[in-house]
Regions:
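N-terminal secretory signal peptides that target proteins for export/translocation
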Residues: 1-13
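Extended interaction regions within the primary functional domain
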Residues: 2, 27, 211-215
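Amphipathic/hydrophobic helical signal segments and adjacent flexible N-terminal regions
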Residues: 3, 30-33
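Bacterial N-terminal signal peptides
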Residues: 15-27
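Structured extracytoplasmic
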Residues: 33-169, 177-183, 187-202, 207-216, ...
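Aspartyl protease active-site motif detector
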Residues: 173
Length: 266
């Protein structure tokens, strides 16, 4: 879901998250007494893996309205903030990757047509990447555990490799009664996030959206934080009115050819 991960906002939340992580590490599958839990975990990973594959490979091009707030924070105080509204387009390119672009329509409540302005931070990639922690080809890179209403994940220790690229990442997904993800959060150790240009914390709230007759689970709310020296860039975005994106092609009338006199009959 974009580059990012979990950054607790209070000591109480940090304590709760640490407790959940302790449960995650203690509940590894393997012992015979945990076989039913292990089976349920594998079923859940299969479900989430299918959702991740859909987003990465079959999610069609689409467009949404993005309403966002970009802030520069220091010691919890806002140093700078910019609000904007934009038309977001996520288009699948010839290489199969989903590329996001935006056309900004208003800045701080005023219409915007052209020119330049400074955003403290901008975050993208929260649609096709938010479920990548459950992609089938990468599940061997993580340690998972299942708890009521959630699944925890933690990247296995060790340096990044071409297959496992998320060292220092830990997070969880909240699940509905059917086992579908409704929220994904994760954090990345700051020392590892910086060279990878990842958010140290990111959270996506997810809801089903129908595109081209198929239901996809897409982010409708995103919050992320990026380190910037002694300051932090905070990015909040809401996505609405998402629909299938189709390019418009205008065909101009053909240039009429000069009339050629018909040859006389022989």
């Amino acid at each position: 879901m974009l580059h990012g991960s979990i950054y607790p906002k209070s000591l109480a939340r940090l304590a709760a998250y640490t407790a959940a992580l302790a449960v995650s590490c203690a509940a590894l599958p393997g012992a015979s007494a945990q076989q039913p839990d292990s089976l349920n975990l594998q079923q859940e990973l299969l479900r989430l893996g299918e959702a991740a594959t859909e987003l990465e490979h079959t999610l069609p091009s689409f467009t949404c309205q993005e309403s966002a707030l970009s802030q520069q924070l220091k010691n919890g105080k806002v140093l700078q903030g910019v609000q904007f509204v934009a038309t977001l387009r996520a288009q699948r390119g010839a290489d199969g990757k989903l590329d996001e672009s935006i056309t900004i329509t208003s800045v701080n409540g005023q219409p915007f047509t052209n020119g330049h302005f400074h955003l403290p931070v901008f975050v993208s990639g929260g649609f096709d990447r938010m479920m990548r922690y459950f992609a089938p080809e990468g599940q061997a890179c993580y340690r998972y555990s299942l708890a009521p209403g959630r699944i925890n994940f933690q990247a296995l220790p060790g340096p990044d490799t071409p297959t496992c690229k998320d060292s220092g990442t830990v997070g969880f997904a909240l699940l509905d009664a059917a086992g579908n993800a409704t929220r994904v959060e994760r954090r990345v150790d700051q020392a590892m996030a910086k060279p990878r240009k990842e958010a140290i914390y990111a959270a996506d709230d997810i809801a089903p959206i129908e595109l081209n007759g198929h239901s996809y689970r897409l982010a409708h709310h995103l919050y992320a934080e990026m380190p910037a020296g002694k300051e932090v860039g905070a990015f909040t975005a809401d996505y609405a009115a998402c629909k299938l994106f189709t390019a418009t092609v205008t065909i101009s009338p053909a240039t009429p050819a000069h009339d050629t006199p018909a040859a006389p009959p022989e």
